[in-house]
Amino acid sequence: MSLKGKWRITRMPDFLADYPDMLEPAYILFEDEGSGEFAFGCCTGQIWEASSTEATSISFSWSGCDEMDQVEGQGIAEIQPDGSLQGEIEYQHGDEFEFFAEKWTSSTAC
């Protein structure tokens, strides 16, 4: 299984249960060329300089906004034996937040 694609963040133990989906459904997206994006709570970030999405684990750098403040940091993610994703988003010189995610399944209205 590849990391490439969109993952729905289902749990972030460091926050109250409803915080990750405060503004939109929490997610992390890994694309080709080491890019991607994520959103949880009031934080949005652009992923750049990521290692290969073809592996089962990835490390990345990111920059974005949290409550309208500029933030940046690093992150890691790894596919678990059950096919879920476990990772951590770290703020530079600051907090580290663990997350758990499942592959995003899209549904199209009929």
What kind of region is each of these model predictions?
Residues M1, L29, E54-S57, K103:
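Low-complexity, Gly/Pro
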Residues M1-R8, T105-T108:
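N-terminal helix-cap/turn-to-beta initiation motif at the start of protein domains
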Residues K6-I9, A17-A55:
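N-terminal glycine/threonine-rich, aromatic-flanked beta-hairpin/loop signature
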Residues R8, E37, S57-S59, S84-Q86, ...:
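General beta-strand recognition
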Residues G36-G41, S59-D66, G87-E90:
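Short beta-strand segments that buttress and anchor functional surface loops
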Residues C43-Q46, D66-E67, Q92-E96:
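Short, surface-exposed beta-strand-loop junctions and turns on beta-sheet-rich folds
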Residues S51-G83:
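Mid-chain, well-packed structural core segment of small domains
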Residues V71-S107:
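Short, compact, well-ordered microdomains
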